[in-house]
């Protein structure tokens, strides 16, 4: 098998794994349309809002052709997401641990090892591509401890690229 075919098969396998995680009912081969962004991110990538909108638009168009309502089938998900991952590969990689650590340290000038969760929330909603309230709530569940602190060395490790290649 050629390297290109190997790569396409790896991408396809990753997309199928992500799809199965969010499958509406086991064996249904359907994912709720609202879960598509999370399922795409489960492939190990971080598309921008514009990229995600493009994916959702393509899936909606395919669903309109098949009369599917509220759900995305495996075949359509696989087709759109695989093509997207292969075409946009360079723009989708997650930052590595050291890059994330440097970014977090910029918000900790005193070197305490943590940043305040409320300050971090305001950064995420006020600059660049803002997170939705739902995304922010889910993120804070994982990021912040019970005292409202984000211990960024641990959190950077969780966010970092896990070494998988597209």
Swiss-Prot record:
Residues 95-130 form the EF-hand domain. The keyword Cytoplasm applies. The keyword Kinase does not apply. Keywords: Cell projection, Cilium, Cytoplasm, Cytoskeleton, Flagellum. It is found in: Cytoplasm, Cytoskeleton, Flagellum axoneme. Pfam families: EF-hand_7. Its main location: cytoplasm. GO terms for cellular component: axoneme; motile cilium; myosin II complex. One of its GO terms (molecular function) is calcium ion binding. Component of the nexin-dynein regulatory complex (N-DRC). Component of the nexin-dynein regulatory complex (N-DRC), a key regulator of ciliary/flagellar motility which maintains the alignment and integrity of the distal axoneme and regulates microtubule sliding in motile axonemes. Belongs to the DRC8 family. PANTHER family: DYNEIN REGULATORY COMPLEX PROTEIN 8, MYOSIN LIGHT CHAIN 1, 3. This is Dynein regulatory complex protein 8. The gene is DRC8.
